[in-house]
Amino acid sequence: WASQVSENRPVCKAIIQGKQFEGLVDTGADVSIIALNQWPKNWPKQKAVTGLVGIGTASEVYQSTEILHCLGPDNQESTVQPMITSIPLNLWGRDLLQQWGAEITMPAPLYSPTSQKIMTKMGYILGKGLGKNEDGIKIPVEAKINQKREGIGYPF
């Protein structure tokens, strides 16, 4: 699973105890939180000993009484004992993200700053392809080495 930072929130699906949930990837949350209205009524929960900070005022805060089996977005095996409260959407916190091997990466630019300035002056728009309709190749073409030296017209 991968998600580029955009105006859309990074959400992904997880399967907890065989039930599918969708949640927001939240690297700022220590623990995962399931929305109270999505928590199955037959799953046991207890009043939480600690409150939740950073999500506003939560009057009812519960925690699962059991450690639950979870499959991440790419079927990563994990376990979770989520908090449960009235929030609009589920939050996948670092307790799950670490088990899923989540990473935050910022790729190096494909082109040097100098070449980007030259291309911008020529009408290049970042994220668009080159060409009349800006629909050309968006990544650099890699040269392929022909180890057999075939196709150049001369037998060796």
Curated annotation (Swiss-Prot):
Post-translational modification: Autoproteolytically processed at the N-terminus. Expected C-terminal autoprocessing not detected. The sequence shown is that of the processed Pro protein.
Domain G-patch, first and last residues per copy: 111-156
Enzyme class: hydrolase
Signal peptide: none
One function term, GO molecular function aspect: nucleic acid binding
Domain of life: Eukaryota
GO terms, biological process: proteolysis; viral translational frameshifting
Keyword Hydrolase: yes
Keyword 4Fe-4S: no
Record protein name field: Endogenous retrovirus group K member 19 Pro protein
